[in-house]
Amino acid sequence: IFEGWCVGARNQKESDLKKGLNKIEKEHDSKLQWRKTVNRYLKNQYKNLFNKIDKLVYLKAPNFNRIFKWRLLQEEKLKLTSKNKKTMSKYKVREFIMFYERITKHMMKDFSKISDLTIFLDNSHRSKKMKFFNK
């Protein structure tokens, strides 16, 4: 099992990279260097890695804001269980997920068409339906 936030992510069309989606992209990547580099890696190196996956299961969140809330909840739980570990503030969590926003939203659009199984999650992180895709 190979698990991760953006496992299986595909590259975007160059034209889709032009408009900054969030504060990080608008203020720190105005020349598109980071976006183009990530996109190139998704198109080449990561594609080669992801092509080795036998079956792809996609856990689809209801929306990107829900992902922020879940990540914040994860941080709050970490705070309770790890007394000596440093955790992120709400601001830092929001900033952290901005780095993954573009890829995540791109995946949310049509990833269920390429995954072998998409599990649609409700706001409470429970499975509400599943969709199998026959390739």
Regions found by a protein language model. Give the residues of each.
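Conserved NTP phosphate-binding and transfer environment spanning the P-loop NTPase/kinase superfamily
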Residues: 6-135
